[in-house]
């Protein structure tokens, strides 16, 4: 686990996401995400790159084997919501980043609810604790009402059903991404230290031993 470090640039629009995915992840951490009656602060993210001959080759990324209908949003423009269904069950939300035409995105892994806990609980279940309502990427999408139909929307457009406001720079901890079998040791998962909403790290059983990953 690495020491806290501060991102010194505060992003204000999608133009500030035309950077490498790790920098974009820093800029999205601490952002306010709002979706269908629920508002949360982004407390955990993961960066993902792209194709082998691109600037950020990443074998763990959906875009690694090239562009297709499913992953096209990852190729830009920046600031678009890329949604996918994990294990055929859970919708997960990413924000595209990098130059238009270059694959990269940031997965929104967890949020701390600011408003709309009752609305989120109606979607997640009455017994779910507030701190856990948006913990984990599938739970976050469920809490905010994000669906596969939101794929490709502009999260910086005022009339979007899901919006992002990028706030002040935040200190961040970094470590390996959760549950992936390729590039499993890259410290491309970032989170706000001390936040109970951050999900637990779990290494994929298919990943090589720590230190042996690319």
From Swiss-Prot:
Pfam families per UniProt: Pur_DNA_glyco (PF02245)
KW tRNA-binding (keyword) present: no
An annotated GO BP: base-excision repair
One GO molecular-function entry: DNA binding
SUPFAM superfamilies xrefs: FMT C-terminal domain-like
Keyword Magnesium attached: no
EC id: 3.2.2.-
Keyword tags: DNA damage, DNA repair, Hydrolase
Cross-referenced CDD domains: AAG
InterPro entries xref list: Formyl_transferase-like_C_sf (IPR011034), MPG (IPR003180), MPG_sf (IPR036995)
Cross-referenced NCBIfam families: 3mg (TIGR00567), PRK00802.1-3 (NF002003)
UniProt similarity note: Belongs to the DNA glycosylase MPG family.
Name used for this protein in its record: Putative 3-methyladenine DNA glycosylase
Organism in which the protein naturally occurs: Mycobacterium leprae (strain TN)
């Amino acid at each position: 686990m690495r020491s806290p470090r501060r991102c010194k640039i505060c992003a204000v629009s999608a133009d500030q996401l035309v950077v490498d995915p790790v920098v974009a992840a820093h800029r999205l951490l601490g952002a306010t995400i709002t979706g269908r009656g629920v508002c949360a602060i982004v407390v955990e993210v993961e960066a993902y790159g792209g194709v082998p001959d691109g600037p950020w080759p990443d074998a763990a990324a959906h875009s690694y084997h090239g562009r297709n209908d499913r992953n096209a949003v990852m190729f830009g423009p920046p600031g678009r919501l890329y949604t996918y269904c994990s294990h055929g069950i859970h919708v997960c939300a990413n924000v595209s980043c990098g130059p238009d035409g270059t694959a990269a995105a940031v997965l929104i892994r967890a949020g701390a609810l600011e408003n709309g806990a009752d609305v989120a609980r109606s979607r997640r279940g009455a017994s779910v604790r507030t701190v856990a309502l948006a913990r984990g990427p599938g739970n976050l999408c469920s809490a905010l009402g994000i669906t596969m139909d939101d794929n490709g929307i502009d999260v910086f457009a005022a009339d979007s059903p899901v919006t992002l406001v990028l706030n002040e720079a935040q200190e961040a901890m970094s470590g390996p991404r959760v549950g992936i079998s390729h590039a499993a040791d890259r410290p491309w998962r970032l989170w706000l230290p001390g936040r109970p909403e951050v999900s637990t790290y779990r290494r994929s059983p298919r990943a090589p031993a720590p230190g042996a990953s690319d």
